[in-house]
Swiss-Prot record:
It catalyses: a 1,2-diacyl-sn-glycero-3-phospho-(1D-myo-inositol-3,4,5-trisphosphate) + H2O = a 1,2-diacyl-sn-glycero-3-phospho-(1D-myo-inositol-3,4-bisphosphate) + phosphate; 1,2-dioctanoyl-sn-glycero-3-phospho-(1D-myo-inositol-3,4,5-trisphosphate) + H2O = 1,2-dioctanoyl-sn-glycero-3-phospho-(1D-myo-inositol-3,4-bisphosphate) + phosphate; 1,2-dihexadecanoyl-sn-glycero-3-phospho-(1D-myo-inositol-3,4,5-trisphosphate) + H2O = 1,2-dihexadecanoyl-sn-glycero-3-phospho-(1D-myo-inositol-3,4-bisphosphate) + phosphate. Changing R692A: Still partially active. Residues 999-1008 have a biased composition (Low complexity). One of its GO terms (biological process) is phosphatidylinositol biosynthetic process. The modification Phosphotyrosine is found at Y887, Y987, Y1136, Y1161. A motif (SH3-binding) lies at residues 945-950. Interacts with tyrosine phosphorylated form of SHC1. Interacts with EGFR. Upon stimulation by the EGF signaling pathway, it forms a complex with SHC1 and EGFR. Interacts with cytoskeletal protein SORBS3/vinexin, promoting its localization to the periphery of cells. Forms a complex with filamin (FLNA or FLNB), actin, GPIb (GP1BA or GP1BB) that regulates cortical and submembraneous actin. Interacts with c-Met/MET, when c-Met/MET is phosphorylated on 'Tyr-1356'. Interacts with p130Cas/BCAR1. Interacts with CENTD3/ARAP3 via its SAM domain. Interacts with c-Cbl/CBL and CAP/SORBS1. The SH2 domain interacts with tyrosine phosphorylated forms of proteins such as SHC1 or FCGR2A. It also mediates the interaction with p130Cas/BCAR1. Residues 119-181, 897-986, 999-1119, 1134-1196 are annotated as: Disordered. This is Phosphatidylinositol 3,4,5-trisphosphate 5-phosphatase 2.
């Protein structure tokens, strides 16, 4: 490779450091930031190219813009700046020569290279090596051959540590954490070895001498341990070979340096064999000596049968107050689930001790509907006759029992499905820092997700998962022995012989993946990789290991990491994460332009992340003793760094409801050992959630976390094992029944326009690359045909349809295309480097009319902008057939007012996806937008505000006919049209509008007539956000499971920045007149959502606009990562021309945004889950049309206010409307709890309201 300054490597030789202007691993975004800080024309730096290995990028600042020039090596290793055609090429031997020439004026660059820009070099604290690269003290164990722990360095005055020369803390610290012995070699003897090699020497005598000197103490320690182990081995095995004796005898003979090293390696190998075999020898000897049968294990575990026994659940029938009056008391049922037989038996006990039972086969159970408000309530829809259903609502003993019942029914459906390939699998993720101690004999609680936090119910713990992934750190067990231990434990637990798919190790960091035997042939494209993140990313005991594979048509990635320790090492942990993200080589090689967070349908990231709590130790212990975890989660470093968008951008994590897993006293889970003796003194290790499991999934995919907790009975380590179980939707290797697509039978992906706002000071041209598994090869667009900038740090680039390619999927079937995703990367024309990547789901883009999309751009783990566009996926009519997925069977009833409120949708069966006809039809109903999403406020940097009490809003029914016909036992009611819903905050589809960006209605549009609703058009209802802690995404009853039961949970970051004026569209079915009326303080009326109950946005200073406030936030603080994209809102002043049938633009969203509330930290760092309700109505023409501009029910807030005034309780109108009780027709279902949530606390007032409603029935 060409050199930087006459040295063999770009960074220069070790003896001659690289010049200040050269930055080896600097990213493009970081380079632009350094140049922006320099601020003077002619400032420059050189970094490695991100697009071409071995090439460089010269970045120059001129007139506040960054200009990038590629420096490419030729076949003779000469360097040259890439030039336009016809310009003569100048070649240089080194980068130093090249920079020297271009430092002169008029050499062809935009300006001369005047001011070299150096990187930021933050000095490490004196105890850096001690805190970062050596973990907690371990119990006395023999050294292991696999250990790579760095021994403590010594001072310069003592090259060899001896017992007579104690080291001092001052002598412990050395540059870069390297020992003084190594440092002295690099300074002096390295040159002598170099000269010897140039002279033809085949060995390195000085390096050998250095290694022998460094390992002399290790020699003696290994000899002692080997001698003791040999004696112990002979006790149990008389035939043991006297290997150690021979080794010690050989050592007494004079040896050269190389012979000493070979002897040490041999000893370590013998030591490894001794340690791995001595337990087996001892067990065999003791068993032979025993006259009775071999003793049973200390904690015997019962072998589980392969079949799942019938499970019974005690429930009560949930009925309305009127029905309860007729019946006399609530009826008790026993629900018996026979998974193997595919039956559900409802057993009702009669008063005369007789029993009445009804049996439903699996195919007659049409849907499960989870209540959002009552966590232990479940609605079950049964098929009584053809196309006629009956719903019963049951109250379980606990929410955990309800979840167990749902899992068993889901398993029953899966087991008896007629599909050849599964739609859904279960995945177990486990992470454990073992503390360099062998595991105990019994780790069943870890395998079965039993312990503290969100654990599985006893009924479901024995159900085997499809995939088990075990990540361990400081695991001293050998790879083969560890794999055998895992397989043996699973065999004993499940009677299944799980097959190992992959095992990857880095030092003592290991990841093992095992799958059910039946899935072995469904696994393909297995890949493994590892990354070191220790000293200089080469030494130490920290890093990551990863495994990836395809399960049929779904890609999975698993990363197990061990990051830098120490309370104060947050920045280094962040860098560890970014290094792993960039360097871990997993997945499809064709996707090398994307980091691993975008290469997989589902990516799981777990391990000992080592993020700590920023709080006084006594406060932490007090909160833990009271089991108050919310205040601790607010100061959790990982949550705070995710909030700043520093790490794990848009990853998800389940709610933490278990105590910190580190640092316990070994042998107990009752005491935290927070004092630790280090060579540099006593160190405080506060209890922390070091061990975590996070995940990131593509938009519009299905994933639910069923458990997340830690064990409380495994005490050998100072960490508790952590477990998480997931229900994951998968796709099959699709085979079209109609064969390959012909020219006349081809699907097309067509783009009308794309616009991106990119964080950059460059003004180059850009193009887009499109990748997808549904394409034969990746495609490129032409360069953008328009660009503009109103801010020096951002650039808006636009492509029209002429610049964008038409993509042709390899298969045209909708069942195949609705599971596909499109990866986009925005690249520059000058350096072909990526400025941002994203993923878009095709599912919501299918249809004959163009749909809008909006999502984030990110690069190397950093948010770099956003991108939006208009596209459609055209599918031939004869290939529109689709089927229901198993995970669409369970939904959430977020408008849970009892069984009368709605009729759930039933299984779609052989429903056809009819999105091709989207033309206006005046006879169809229009369903208004009843609530606007309230965007959360950016929290202060010092901590997170407490979440206010949550209130479950009411959503307006989409179908007026269903309101009057729904009953608790809906016999004789035909099933309504099926509904479909997509909910993924990492990607927004709302007729082109991200839900939280919808503005309040402008006065100019207050009386504007609406376009008529369209056939099969998506009807949307966006209720007010849930700001409290939550476990389950709040979604609508009857929706598809993409939203209802885990369609990719909210990402752990803030909502995207509001787009410029042109970004906001009014959905065609938005009725301005149906917006809730909120009375302001002045007594006037304003249409839009009611203001939040608490934490309003603080008033702005006089003369300050919202835009200037955001810009001020950027300028005032050093950490600009949270607000950098918010600056992009000032860029676009050009209208984004809507296509045919699309609505007009709205005024500036900066003036129309609803007030922000506090961020939701229930699921750490996830903003309040959006609830976009999209129902594809197939038979809307049959419904009674609503009057133009009127409410679907015919009764609005006006009727509510008149009724309240009539009984003298008008004071509660605002509270009731704010909580969704804005319709008299549904007010009859209100309960005392609902009234309290709406602010009715007076018992007499509550009684009056309920009695009046009862009489009105």
């Amino acid at each position: 490779m060409a050199s930087v300054c006459g040295t063999p490597s770009p960074g220069g030789a070790l003896g001659s450091p690289a010049p200040a202007w050269y930055h080896r691993d600097l990213s493009r975004a970081a380079a632009e930031e350094l140049l922006a800080r320099a601020g003077r024309d002619g400032s420059f730096l050189v970094r490695d190219s991100e697009s071409v290995a071995g090439a460089f990028a010269l970045c120059v600042l001129y007139q506040k813009h960054v200009h990038t020039y590629r420096i490419l090596p030729d076949g003779e290793d000469f360097l040259a700046v890439q030039t336009s055609q016809g310009v003569p090429v100048r070649r240089f031997q080194t980068l130093g020569e090249l920079i020297g020439l271009y430092a002169q004026p008029n050499q062809g660059l935009v300006c001369a290279l005047l001011l070299p820009v150096e990187g930021e070099r933050e000095p490490d604290p004196p105890d850096d090596r001690d805190a970062s690269d050596v973990e907690d003290e371990k119990p006395p164990l023999p050294p292991r051959s696999g250990s790579t722990s760095i021994s403590a360095p010594v001072g310069p005055s003592s090259p060899l540590p001896t017992p007579e020369t104690p080291t001092t803390p001052a002598a412990e610290s050395t540059p870069n954490g390297l020992s003084t012995v190594s440092h002295e070699y690099l300074k002096g003897s390295y040159g002598l070895d170099l000269e010897a090699v140039r002279g033809g020497a085949s060995n390195l005598p000085h390096l050998t001498r250095t290694l022998v000197t460094s390992c002399r103490r290790l020699h003696s320690e290994v000899d002692k341990v080997l001698s003791g182990l040999e004696i112990l081995s002979k006790v149990f095995d008389q035939q043991s070979s006297p290997m150690v004796t021979r080794l010690l005898q050989q050592q007494s003979l004079p040896q050269t340096g190389e012979q000493e090293l070979e002897s040490l390696v041999l000893k370590l190998s013998v030591l490894k064999d001794f340690l791995s075999g001595i337990q087996k020898k001892a067990l065999k000897a003791l068993q032979d000596m025993s006259s009775t049968a071999p003793p049973a294990p200390l904690q015997p575990s019962i072998r589980k049968a392969k079949t799942i026994p019938v499970q019974a659940f005690e429930v009560k029938l949930d009925v309305t107050l009127g029905d309860l009056t007729k019946i006399g008391k609530s009826q008790k049922f026993t629900l018996s689930v026979d998974v193997e037989g595919g039956r559900l038996v409802l057993l009702r006990r009669q008063r005369d001790s007789q029993e009445d039972w009804t049996t439903f086969t699996h195919d007659r159970i049409r849907q499960l509907i989870k209540s959002q408000r009552v966590q232990n309530k479940l609605g079950v829809v049964f098929e009584k006759e053809k196309d006629r259903t009956q719903r019963k609502d049951f109250i379980f003993v606990s929410a955990r029992k309800r979840e167990a019942f749902c899992q068993l029914l889901q398993l029953m459906k899966n087991r008896h499905s007629k599909q050849d390939e599964p739609d859904m699998i279960s995945v177990f993720i486990g992470t454990w820092n073992m503390g360099s101690v062998p595991p105990p004999k019994n780790v069943t609680s870890w395998f079965t997700s039993k312990g503290l936090g969100k654990a599985l119910d006893e009924v479901t713990v024995t159900i085997p998962h499809d995939i088990y992934v075990f990540g361990t750190q400081e695991n001293s067990v050998g790879d083969r022995e560890w794999l055998d231990l895992l397989r043996g434990g699973l065999k004993e637990l499940t009677d299944l012989d799980y097959r190992p798919i992959a095992m990857q190790s880095l030092w003592n960091i290991k990841v093992a993946v095992l799958v059910k035997p039946e899935h072995e042939n469904r696994i393909s494209h297995v890949s493994t990789s590892s990354v070191k993140t220790g000293i200089a990313n080469t030494l130490g005991n920290k890093g990551a290991v990863g495994v990836s594979f395809m399960f049929n048509g779904t890609s999975f990635g698993f990363v197990n990491c061990h990051l830098t320790s120490g309370n104060e090492k947050t920045t280094r942990r962040n860098q560890n994460y970014l290094d792993i993200l960039r360097l871990l080589s997993l997945g499809d090689r064709q996707l090398s332009a994307f980091d691993i967070s975008l290469r997989f349908t589902h990516l799981f990231w777990f391990g000992d992340l080592n993020y700590r709590l920023d709080m006084d130790i006594q406060e932490i212990l007090n909160y833990i003793s009271r089991r108050e975890f919310e205040p601790l989660l607010r100061v959790d470093q990982l949550n705070l760094e995710r909030e700043k968008h520093k790490v794990f951008l848009r990853f998800s994590e389940e709610e933490i409801s278990f105590p910190p897993t580190y640092r316990y006293e070994r042998g107990s889970r009752d005491t935290y050992a927070w004092h630790k003796q280090k060579p540099t003194g006593v160190r405080t290790n506060v209890p922390s959630w070091c061990d975590r499991i996070l995940w990131k999934s593509y938009p519009e995919t299905h994933i639910i976390c069923n458990s997340y907790g830690c064990t409380d009975d495994i005490v050998t380590s100072d960490h508790s094992p952590v477990f998480g179980t997931f229900e994951v939707g998968v796709t099959s290797q699709f085979i079209s029944k109609k064969g390959l697509s012909k020219t006349s039978d081809q699907a097309y992906i067509e783009f009308e326009s794309i616009e991106a706002i990119v964080k950059t000071a460059s003004r180059t041209k850009f193009f887009i690359e499109f990748y997808s598994t549904c394409l034969e090869e990746y495609k490129k667009s032409f360069e953008n045909d328009a660009q503009s900038s109103d801010n020096i740090n951002f650039l808006k680039v636009q492509w029209s349809s002429r610049q964008l390619p038409t993509l042709k999927p390899i298969l045209a079937d909708i069942e195949y295309l609705q599971d596909q995703h499109l990866l986009l990367t925005v690249k520059s024309m000058d350096g072909y480097e990526s400025y941002g990547e994203c993923v878009v789901a095709l599912k919501s883009m299918i249809g004959s009319t163009a749909q809008q999309f909006l999502t984030f751009l990110s690069h190397r783990g950093e948010e770099t902008g956003n991108i939006r566009g208009s596209m459609k996926v055209r599918v031939p009519t004869e290939r529109l057939g689709t089927r229901e997925r198993l995970y669409e069977w369970i939904s959430i009833d977020k408008d849970d007012t009892g069984a009368k409120s709605k009729v759930p949708s039933v299984s779609r069966g052989s429903q056809e996806h009819r999105s091709g006809s989207r033309k206006p039809a005046s006879t169809e109903t229009s369903c208004p937008l009843s609530k606007l999403f309230e965007e959360p406020e950016k929290p202060p940097p010092t901590g997170r505000p407490p979440a206010p009490p949550r209130a479950v809003p009411r959503e307006e029914p989409l179908n007026p006919r269903l309101k009057s016909e729904g009953t608790s036992e809906q016999e004789g009611v035909a099933a309504p049209p099926p509904k479909n819903s997509f909910n993924n905050p990492a990607y927004y589809v709302l007729e082109g509008v991200p839900h939280q960006l919808l503005p309040l209605e402008p006065p100019s549009l207050a009386r504007a007539p609406l376009p008529p609703a369209t056939k099969n058009k998506v009807a949307i209802t966006v209720p007010a956000p849930q700001l409290g802690r939550h476990r389950t995404p709040r979604v609508g009853e009857g929706s598809s499971s993409d939203e209802d039961s885990g369609g990719t949970l909210p990402p752990p970051d803030f909502p995207p920045p509001p787009l410029p004026d042109s970004a906001i569209f009014l959905p065609p079915n938005l009725d301005p007149l149906s917006m809730p009326v909120v009375r302001g303080r002045s007594g006037g009326e304003a249409r839009g959502p009611p203001p939040p109950k608490a934490h309003p946005r603080p008033p702005l200073p006089p003369g300050t606009s919202p835009a200037s406030t955001f810009l001020g936030e950027v300028a005032s603080g050093d950490d600009r990562s949270c607000s950098v994209l918010q600056m992009a809102k000032t860029l676009s002043e050009v209208d984004y021309a809507p296509g045919p049938g699309r609505s007009a633009l709205l005024p500036n969203p900066l003036e129309l945004q609803p007030p922000r509330g506090p961020s939701d930290y229930g699921r750490p760092l996830s903003f309040p889950p959006p609830r976009i309700r999209e129902s594809i109505q197939e038979d809307l023409a049959e419904e009674a049309p609503c009057p133009q501009g009127g409410r679907a029910s015919g009764l609005g807030e006006a009727g509510m206010g008149a009724w309240l005034r009539a009984i003298g309780l008008e004071r509660y109108e605002e509270g009731l409307v704010h909580n969704g009780w804005d319709d008299l027709e549904f007010l009859s279902d209100i309960t005392e709890e609902d009234l309290e949530e709406a602010g009715v606390q007076d018992p007499a007032h509550k009684r009056l309201l309920l009695d009046t409603l009862q009489l009105s029935k």
